Amino acid sequence: MKLTCVLIITVLFLTACQLTTAVTYSRGEHKHRALMSTGTNYRLLKTCRGSGRYCRSPYDCRRRYCRRISDACV
């Protein structure tokens, strides 16, 4: 019985700590830049490459296919 009470109190305490942290971050007091959203879509700022152009990932190409052998958009 005592162990159950201790576990319940511990869980409630940890939940309260999580909620307090969430409220602090939602007020815009971010400590890390990675937690903040830039508000812009990366895809809108980037131009897609045409067929035969150099690519490193499928997302670089218009048709979403980057040939790994030649590193060129197809």
From Swiss-Prot:
Keyword Disulfide bond tagged: yes
Principal subcellular localization: secreted
Subcellular localization: Secreted
Ranges that cross the membrane: none
GO MF entry, a single one: toxin activity
Expressed in which tissues: Expressed by the venom duct.
Keywords: Acetylcholine receptor inhibiting toxin, Disulfide bond, Neurotoxin, Postsynaptic neurotoxin, Secreted, Signal, Toxin
Positions of the propeptide segment: 23-33
GO annotation, cellular component aspect: extracellular region; host cell postsynaptic membrane
Signal peptide: 1-22
UniProt PTM comment: May contain 2 intrachain disulfide bonds and probably one interchain disulfide bond forming the homodimer. The disulfide pairing is not important for activity towards the different nAChR subtypes, since this peptide without disulfide bond or with different disulfide bonds shows the same activity.
InterPro entries: Conotoxin
The record's note on its domains: The cysteine framework is C-C-C-C-C.
Quaternary structure and interacting proteins, as annotated: Homodimer; disulfide-linked.
Function: The activity of this natural homodimer has not been tested due to low abundance. The synthetic linear peptide has been refolded, giving 4 different monomeric isomers (m1 to m4) with 2 disulfide bonds each. All isomers potently inhibit rat alpha-1-beta-1-delta-epsilon/CHRNA1-CHRNB1-CHRND-CHRNE and human alpha-9-alpha-10/CHRNA9-CHRNA10 nicotinic acetylcholine receptors (nAChR). In addition, they show a modest inhibition at human alpha-3-beta-2/CHRNA3-CHRNB2, alpha-3-beta-4/CHRNA3-CHRNB4, alpha-7/CHRNA7, and alpha-4-beta-4/CHRNA4-CHRNB4.
Family indicated by similarity: Belongs to the conotoxin O1 superfamily.
UniProt name for this protein: O-conotoxin GeXXXIA
